[in-house]
Amino acid sequence: LLRVGTERVDAADGPRPALAALVDWHVDFALRHRALIVVQDRDWEALPQEARDRVRTLQRDYVDLWAAQLRLDDPALDLATARAMAHATFGLINSTPHSGLLPDTRMRGLLRRMALGSLGIA
């Protein structure tokens, strides 16, 4: 997520297009890798501590990638709030393994609209 997310941000023309690109990437990943999301949640404690530390570092960097764009878009946001917004958006998008009610094309559009709306950039 971090590598491609960084590429998307680097290719974007400003924070709002960067956030839209991040949303699109995360939605795409979540729809294509539902099982991975479930396994990570379920088997987290089975990972050795060193692996958990590495994953947490990558996750923090990914959150901060989003938070930086949110703060560029709205300089009044403090870092803690921007991180909380990113986490809340991830929760929305990562709910896909538990929602098989819509075909992927409709789910993609729904998640995109909801995620962008939650970030205030709809």
PLM regions and their residue ranges:
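Amphipathic alpha-helical linker/stalk segments
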Residues: 1-20
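Short, structured motif recognition centered on aromatic/hydrophobic residues
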Residues: 1-2, 20-23, 40, 89, ...
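Amphipathic alpha-helical packing segments from all-alpha helical-bundle domains
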Residues: 2, 49-74, 83-87, 109
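Solvent-exposed, charged/polar functional surfaces in cytosolic regulatory/catalytic domains
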Residues: 3-8, 25, 29, 61, ...
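Short amphipathic alpha-helical interaction patches enriched in hydrophobic/aromatic residues
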Residues: 5, 9, 48, 74, ...
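Residue-level recognition of alpha-helical structural elements
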Residues: 15, 19, 51, 78-82, ...
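Amphipathic C-terminal alpha-helical segment
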Residues: 29-32, 36, 68, 79, ...
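Amphipathic alpha-helical segments used for helix-helix packing
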Residues: 30-50
